[in-house]
Amino acid sequence: MNGLKREHESSSSQDGSKTPETEYDSHVDSIEDIHSLASKRKKLNEKKENLEDLTLLKTSAFELKLNELIREISVRGKYFRHANTFVEKIKDLIFKTPVIPETNFWSACKNLEKDKKVIVPLAEPLSAKDTNLRASFVPPKTVTPGIFSCSNKFFLNPDGWSYDLFLEIPESIFTQKDYLNGRYFRKRAFYLTCIAKHLLENLGNEVKLEFVAFNDDIRRPILAILPESKGFAATGKRFTVFLIPTVRQIFPVSKLLPHKNAIRDFMEHEELKPTPFYNNSVLEEQNLLFYRDLVKKYSVNPQFLDACGLGSTWLNMRGFSSSIHSNGFGLLEWYVLMALLMSSTGLPAGNVLNTYLTAAQFFKSMLQFLSSKNLTSTLFKLNADSSNLKIGNGHLPTLIDCNTGFNLLGKMKQSFFEYFQASCRHTLNLLDENANYNFSKIFITHVNVPALEFDVSGCIPLEPKELEDPNFCRKTDLDSPYSLYLEYTWDLLQHALGDRVCQIILYSSICTSCSINESLKTKLPKLISFGLLLNPDALLRLVDIGPSPDDTVGSQKFREFWGEVSELRKFKNGSIAESVYWECSSPDERIRIPQRIIRHILNRHLGNNVGDRVSFRNEKFRVYVHSKISPNTDTYNEYVPVMEAYNEAVKSLINLSDIPLSIAEILPADESLRYSSSSVPFYESSTCAPIDVVFQFESSSKWPDELEGIQRTKIAFLLKIAELLEALDNVERASVGLENTDNPTHNCCFLQVLFSNNFTFRYRLRNDREIFFWKSLERNPSTKLSAQKGLYAYEHMFQFIPRHTLAIQAICQAHRSYSMAVRLAKHWFYSHLLTDHVTDEVIELLVASVYINSSSWRTTSSGETSFCRMLHFLAHWDWRFDPLIINSNGKLPHDVRHQATEKLESIRKQDVAIAHNAYYIITDYDFDGNHIGYYKPSKIIANRITSLARASLSELLKDTPNYKSIFKSSLDIYHVVIDVNINKLPMYRESNLTKYKNLQNMSSERPGFEPITEFVKELHRCFEDTISFFYNKKNPKVVTGVFNPRILANRPYRTNIDYPFKVVDKDTVVLDADVVCEEIRQVGGDLIRSIQLQLKA
């Protein structure tokens, strides 16, 4: 039950079991069917109010999905009826619990525990045992449904579902002063234990009884009753009854306001400090019945309850709960706040909820209120005009109901509240952008997954001795040493990291519970989890500057906080200040400064080498990435030499003066110039693949009037330019190369220039007159097909690729981590042998979608996290019906998704087999999606990518993932495995150049020549309809193949069979795979070491 027994942090999704995410996914498609019914609805009553008519007629797909979601998370009536019988039995037993006359509290506890069946769950600190504390037991005045149960509508959560019962303790049990020094909580614990013991004696093995810390506050135990009978197991949903002791308002509210002190036993000789957390806990206890009655009043409105169901799902998906070790705002607060906003007086305009709102409007209004700036900057009061309660400004956040004095945000830390508000605002943005399309991002996707949510995440393991602080009660009004340790650690890290992080979250996802014969205080969590959202603007700062020496107090505090790493430094402007300098020998060390700060500060202030024990979740992933991709985390800087060489290449060309036409434009057209190549030129190898550049002359009417003539003129221009470039001091060699020699109307030449900096650039000349001639040929039926191919090739090479390069450059410059993310993504695609089956441009846009498009998470500053999010997108993207839209510069029309969806529907109707556009991707520079994903990937490869992404994501989300397996593809699924003789490949030969000086002059005379790529192209040409080939161009040790399924089966002999076959019987033949392998060997020659045929009979 949200707020009582908190969900565990994505544990079910990590161990492979079914999660709400996978469970909900199965219903989304069915909602789409419902959408078609909405258009068929007719007006039932022409005389209805306009608002009602509009609501009926404009029932959106989003609202239909909400209705379906509510239906899915609601507990069915048959389950409730079965559970209600059990609850009535519990209530009868509670009222029959034996009376215990008033006696000394400690004697009563000892007597209750003497048979060792139960232990009274008392929290520290305990008052001196000679105090005259009295205890007694009489049955509760009432046993009634709690806040979640009073409406008889129950919602599922990750732990199943629950029924909360409020036990109203008679006022005679307490005195007017029992709110002081924890007396109320001790009597409450004794009272609950009496009931627990009676239930144990009467129910025996029928139930499992546990004490659970209410909201993880061990001062406030509640009793969890879990039925063990087969009848409940048959329901398929875990069911729990929670018994929650409560009282009516018996303590004066004025004594329990945030600025008051209510813990005095241990502060007798000290200044009495305010105890806001303790006071708020007491106020919550004595107002639960009041808030239950308020919620029950508004529960007659089904839209109110549905909005609570939506709130429950939204909170669960983000890991928000009422736990003081987590967020501090859960479903209980959601129910109460909704009821208060409907009933409170004196609220500013726009904050009042009206009864005529729909569930969706209730939900959105709640998020708008919770994200309000008023809650962060001021003391927000409800019912202030009807109360004389004087409430002073205390710690924020504060949202106080003046009728009760209860602060609804009292369990939240300010920084957690800021994070909570950011989540509210992010959800509102998703709703405003496209509520229907973003439905799954809001309600279905598990957001609280550290590998997907944070830039840096990990845990701090604690030893038992670190939670044994007998004096913790002198330092805080919190419930336990763990809560104090968590808060102190949070304050330390927040102060130490400062503006290097946008957000820091510390939490525990472990529910504090124990058997009724154990003590809750021995079951405190032994782990603190944390997550950081980094600030890219301050992340790489080397020096943290403190106060000047003139500020003696500030300087002393700075040195005490930082310890031996602090020092006085003089800066270039002449100023002197206390500072901390983080020495870094590489960009990777610089980006890891936050991790170094965490370890240092925890070691210094917590001792016991706590900092050294910190485990960063992505540490091993980062190590693996560095070994495969780059030793640097910020790979953006690795491209600085490439961009400098490009600028030199541009200047060298544009400064030429002896060419007939002046150059109008030079554009980058290569993955190396968009910071996204799988390997940086010259960074990992001694050679450089040619870097493509496109340039264009100013317009001229003297160009030939036919395509072949234009190509010959291009050759003449490039020969002249090559001659001029070779005369420059910074050019080693310039030559004109030919391509497309079998098709003279296509671009057939390029200029390849080797500069003295060893970078090779390949220039291609663009002439837009070619488009006119291609379109003219397209109008002729006899040349239409070839003209369409020629036009596509021209537009792709000279228009799309340069525009794509500029767009990706802009993304990478705005998000420096994009470079690492896209290189990781390419490594993943290549590792699974998908080279040439998915184009680099498609991969780059898949990663760009993580940064450009809205998602369940805010934009990350970590390449590794972005890669994980890309896998999440691929694992859940239904590319059959959902277009991918990349609006990189914001120029696409606002209804682009509607247009793209309609276009995709039309494409799928015309191409049912999905021969083209398996991935339908729209960008602002390719609005029709003709150049991205039109040919590649194919439908089969797209399905393969989805399967690989799901498997990889599942592995990544495990507690101890095997990162190597994510980038390793099994060879068992392939029919043919060709073992490549890697000694024949330049990329492996060149690794020896740095080892042997006599080989350093043997660098390749053909920059960029890749024998394995040419080999695979030749295989595709020879066996196009017989076998599909797969390889990894970054590490081509094997080439694999899969036979076309249609030729594997026996088939009747035909004279037009175009593949090797052997006779099975008189008129039946089958593929002769051995002959195919022999033909492959002949094509590969020395490149092939061996061929393994894995075709099963």
Swiss-Prot record:
The keyword rRNA processing applies. GO terms for molecular function: snoRNA binding. It is found in: Nucleus, Nucleolus. One of its GO terms (cellular component) is UTP-C complex. Keywords: Nucleus, Ribonucleoprotein, Ribosome biogenesis, RNA-binding, rRNA processing. One of its GO terms (biological process) is rRNA processing. Residues 1-10, 18-27 have a biased composition (Basic and acidic residues). InterPro entries: NOL6/Upt22, Nrap_D1, Nrap_D2, Nrap_D3, Nrap_D4, Nrap_D5, Nrap_D6. Disulfide bonds: none annotated. Residues 1-27 are annotated as: Disordered. It holds the Pfam family Nrap_D3. Its main location: nucleus. Belongs to the NRAP family. Component of the ribosomal small subunit (SSU) processome. Involved in nucleolar processing of pre-18S ribosomal RNA and ribosome assembly. This is U3 small nucleolar RNA-associated protein 22. It comes from Schizosaccharomyces pombe (strain 972 / ATCC 24843) (Fission yeast).
